[in-house]
Amino acid sequence: MNDSTQILDESGDFSFLSLNENKSRSRSTSTCSINSVEIIDGGSCDSSGDDDKNNSYLDEEKKRILRKTYLYFNANNKKTQLNFIIDNQVLDWIFNQTKTKISKPICESLKNGVALCKIINLIKPNTIKKINLNSSIFSYRENLTNFTKGCESIGMTEDMSRFQELVFEDKESAVLQLLYSLMKFSEKILPNTISTSPPSQLNICKSPVLLKKAAAQSSSSSPTTSTSASTSTSTSPSSSNESIAKPILSALSSSSSTLFSAAPTPTSTNTVPYKFIGHSKSKLFGQQQQQQQQQQQQQQQQQQQQQQQQQQQQQQQQQQQQQQQQQQPPPQTSTCTTTQPTTTTTEEHKLAPPPPLIVPNTSSLPPPQPTTSSIIKKAAPAPLKKPSPANTSSNSLLNHLPPPPSSSSTASSAINTPISTPSTSKSNSFQKPNNNFQKPIQIAHVEPIIEENEIEDNTNNNNNNNNNNNNNNNNNNNNNNNNNNNNNNNNTNDNINNNNKNNNNNQNENEDEVKPVHSPPKVRPPLPSRVGRGQLLRSSSEEIQFDIENASVSEAPSPVMTMNEDYSIVTDANSLTNHYNGANEYTTTTTAATTNLPNESSSRSNSASSNGDQNNNNNNNNNNNNNNNNNNNNNNNNNNNNNNNNLQLPAKINSEPNNQYNTISTSSPSTTGTILESPNGSSIFSQPLNNNNNINNENNNSNNSNSLVTSSSPPLSLPAYSANGSPNCPQGKKQRSGTKLRSFFGVKSKPESKSVSNFYGVGNSINQPPSNSSPKQSPVPNNPPSVSQSFLNLSMNSKSSKKKKDNISPDINSNSNNNNNNNNNNNNNNNNNNNNNNNNNNNNNNNNNNNNNLEEDENPLTMSNQSANSLKSSGNHFEDDITNGNNNISQNQNQNQNQNQNQTQNQNQNQNQNHISHSNSISSGNLNNHVNQNNNVNEESVDSELMKALSKVEFLFKDRKVLKERINFTYPEKYLKFFVNMDELIQIDNSTTFLTESLLSKRPSQQLELCHQEERRFLSEIVTLQNVLNVVEENKNLITRTEEMQKMIDSLMKEKKELINEKNTLASMLAKTKQQQQQQSNDTVSQRKMVDDGIVYNYNHGKYEIKGGTTEKLIELLYNSEFIGSDYFETFLLTYRSFASPKRVMDVLTKTYNENYSVEGNATDDVEKRLELDQFNKQRKDTHLKICNFLKRWVEKHFYDFDQDLLQEFNTFIANCRVINHQDFLQKTLNKKLIPLSSSELKLVFSTPTPAPILPKTPITCFEDMDPAEIARQLTLIEFNLFKNIANKEFLSLSWQKQDKEKRSPNLLKMIYRFNEVSNWVTSTIVKETTNIKKRASYLKRFIKLAEELRKLNNFNGVFVIVSGLHSASVNRLKNTWAEISKQQQKQFEEFVALTSPQSSFASYRLELRQSTGASIPYLGVHLSDLTFVEEGNQDKLENGYTNFSKCRLIAEQIKAIQEFQQEPYNLREVEEMIPFITHKAVPESECFNLSLICEPRESVN
């Protein structure tokens, strides 16, 4: 039969590489879809697709298969993509749980982390105490960090450490994979949670690691198990299930594990093999539901019958065991029986062994892994049941296998039909993990295989494995008798005959006669929470948990430790368990099957397992007891086998959890390299042993003096999983320490223990006594192996491989070697039980097995034999590695097929000649150990060092990667660019790293040197990264502390500000109080003083104002040097006429000026007198200067005061002035006012051009010929000329109301007269049209339009004039005329009336006047009313007779307001033609009223 190996391309489909006996590579004719997995028959794969299409696909896929290194694979592999169905499932689940709509892009919607934190709290309330709802990036990261920690606290075993990074990098596929795992986990722990869609719709691409392990595990397993083994398959896991996953294989991602759905618990291993026939997805639900229900009922009845039969069989076995124990001497192993809650099957009810599943086989390559048949799309999970204390679910890929049909079932068997899964050399069986899916899902179509050729091949493939099952059966029943040893076949005949029949061919057995024996499915306990960062389990809908029954070990769950690497994650289900043999070799068992454990074989660590050792001891004991005809050679062989299979940790291991990782990182396993041990006995991947372990190590070293121990090997460390005897169950994680590198590189080699590493990378190991050996058992000395033979064997194996170019981890082949050592023991059992085998046959069988173990595909590169094969076995991520061991087993089995014992002996002898192996020299006791030793000693030394260097390189690479991830996770914004630059600098992808072709093409010494260079470089980088990480963490702590301190500072600053404000408020209040008191006191003093001096002050609005004073004092303040204020000058000049005449003011100023001339001192005066004189003269000069400035302002601003008499006095003052500068200054000011300016000089210049007048084309003859806008302009010019000529004195003392008003206010009276004239013009123009009402109405409209134009020109006086004319009694009574105008014009006129309304002291007018800009003409009636109010409301004199200067100040304010409008003229042009029509004599009011009566007579009243 051609062995086949699965290969997964990037598209997610399976293809099969068929390998014939000559190791030639040929591609199969079809591919298997990921949704319909099939069993290969004769190297082919059944598929419903077109052959041509498949062939073209295979050709394309052949080009796409990459042979890359482990490092390159981890760095460059693409993440498998979830299909849109899974996307919708996850999004709908999030919406149903949190009522939060997640839209695309998904990462952008999930970036705030609020919905994710809510999901965690829904799964386990109060897990996340605080959810940050802010929109800052810091809040997002805090929520995502809490979500990651929450996943760990609720028991989530997926590696969520990179979730935050994936979200911020918008890697939706990876994020959805992790969320899908969380969804399935929540369904598991929350039974009420309903899955959004059937899991069979899952369409996830499988990784190469997964497919390789699937093929390797099934290929190395045996098709049948013994009766006792079958009874234990559904009950308890073997110790291999709890063993530690190798670091390179413990990284199966959760996305890969979701590819396989859970299968029901197998109740019996005696079932018919079957194969899956692919079909479309549309047929997955609803084709065989009725048949499945019927089949389930039949199976339940069969299970009940089988249980009864098993109980009877168990009773018979117990009786036989008791009889044999009386006849036999005490066994050497501890027989503490483990109680298992399962039923056993009697010999009478045993069934013939079925042919094995036709799956790819492996021999010496990676450890047993799932078969192609095990890779199915989500078989229907069984409902969740209460866990049994003695049952656990093995975390294996084979747990996801759908059940096979019984012989009487139809092609589509029931979902819970058990499957006979191939077991390894330790008779492992598989159990279905827990599942919470309540909805059954149909699986692929199943048919039994009845071809004879397949039965033959499978039977031959698993001859040795049948005996392995016998060993396990001995362990399970703890009896060393013939019945247990020969309980291999499941027939009801004699045990020895069954063994002989099994050793021969089972090809003639009829499959139709084989019926499955069912047992009720067992309950699986839930998986505990993951502790430790970087640990992952598959994200399927059920949890995997190991339950251990041991005398010295308590039950403990076992989460999986994985790397913190993308795309290379292996679950614990696919991990390997390494067992040491007594000859310092490895035995490998999968963690996929479950078996009963003896109570004293509970030691579990990464380096050894006591189960396999105890099995081998039982086999040897049984052989010695049952087969009395065996000679000493046979005993020696058995003892050698015992030594081969009993290298393990002592039985007493600290049951307390110790999760101190020995690597720099805690988020991923440290290495996938060789498992090396330190001289003190503790593996680098395990915990340090206690004192008892050290004692056992010393005893074992004394017994096995020829063990291969290399103390100089670096102790590559991995998380130590031996908590409570259960592997893979860290209870916590320890912060990684850079000082642990010393334990890796600080171990010095001892010359006496120096030796080469074996082919599988076991560079150094500790000889440890088996935990199950009794004190009476004496150690059997081992013959030292021949170094030359071992490397010759390596060379033979290297030449025998034809296709392998990829590289796999050295851990895998070391495990495969261990499996083959177990096969040696099984062959010994076969020969001893049959009583016809002699010592030579026994030795030959062992040699044969060892040869098969060491067979490898040839590496075309020119690397040395041992290192090449070892390095090939170091990578576990590629597909082609699986086929090596399959072909080797196939050769061994084909040679043993259809032969009697003599033929078997001859063929084994021939193989012994062709394949000299290291294990052969140890197990057979061959003394040819020194052949060609001198030729290979240098090569083996280089290869040994090369293996160590490669392990170090890989170890350091992963530590460096983890450090980078931690740094980027801690502070990615700041340090991400730095590490990108660092990667460019070191050029990791372009350098010669671990297992590249450029490395393998060099000589071993060059390879070693390159590895040392990489090691030094990685060490330097790690030191740098460690320093950077420390700095980053310190910076983060400092930032946190800085933020806290900043908050404290802000709060203190806020409090400080509040205190300062309160202080300022109190201080201001106190200051005001003091100031008021001081001012009151000052006012009292000043007022008393000023009263005495003739001046009275008033304090108003924080300043002193002159309230009153005598006329002389008020004039004196004009030149007082101590009094400063220009406002006083203006107020005095505007209002002085109310209390003094201009002549009196001029006389006082002239007198004061003449009295303040400078005084000349004598030359004999002393300095002090001179200074006093100078100060006195300075004051006088200041008085002169102030008088001159006042006179200048008086002449410029109020020249109208200078009549003829006053002008003469002013000229006299100038003539008598002795200060020449002052005389010239005053004379120039007077000349400007006396000399009239020319017209050109008087012309004003405006910034804007003068608008052109609006004139009719024809000469103006009447009022209708003129435009209202131009009429408004001409009226404004006339009124402004009158307004600007009004002098300030005309507004004083109500001059316009006095008898001599014509003299005192001539210009003001002209303005008043003009107002009345225009108003009379408006009235008379309308009422004169007595006959034509239409014409009167048109006049009325034109005057309203004229008022609008005047308002636009800010001529408020004109607006008041028009409104006054139209509102007169003569016009207002003309109702018929007002009725002729439109409502719009009437409304407009009402607005003018409101503007001129005297309501609220003309508030509307005052407001619009303040808001006006440009030239304006105010309505003087309002301002004259204000002056009248001030004059009449205030007295001219104070009580003491002083002038009331406060009244003068109020009058000055009104006059100043009028003066502001006089300063800005209009930019208009005068039109002389229009003057006659807008100026006329006024018509008396009585006459106008009479004309109004003529226009509209009064209505008669009847």
From Swiss-Prot:
One of its GO terms (cellular component) is plasma membrane. Keywords: Coiled coil, Guanine-nucleotide releasing factor. SMART domains: CH, RasGEF, RasGEFN. It holds the Pfam family RasGEF_N. The keyword Cell cycle does not apply. Residues 1102-1249 form the N-terminal Ras-GEF domain. One of its GO terms (molecular function) is guanyl-nucleotide exchange factor activity. Residues 287-328, 451-515, 1032-1076 form a coiled coil. Residues 216-242, 325-436, 456-534, 589-935 are annotated as: Disordered. It comes from the Eukaryota. Residues 518-528 have a biased composition (Pro residues). Residues 218-242, 325-345, 371-400, 407-421, 458-508, 589-646, 663-675, 686-719, 764-790, 813-853, 883-935 have a biased composition (Low complexity). One of its GO terms (biological process) is Ras protein signal transduction. Residues 422-436, 861-876 have a biased composition (Polar residues). Promotes the exchange of Ras-bound GDP by GTP. This is Ras guanine nucleotide exchange factor P. It comes from Dictyostelium discoideum (Social amoeba). The gene is gefP.
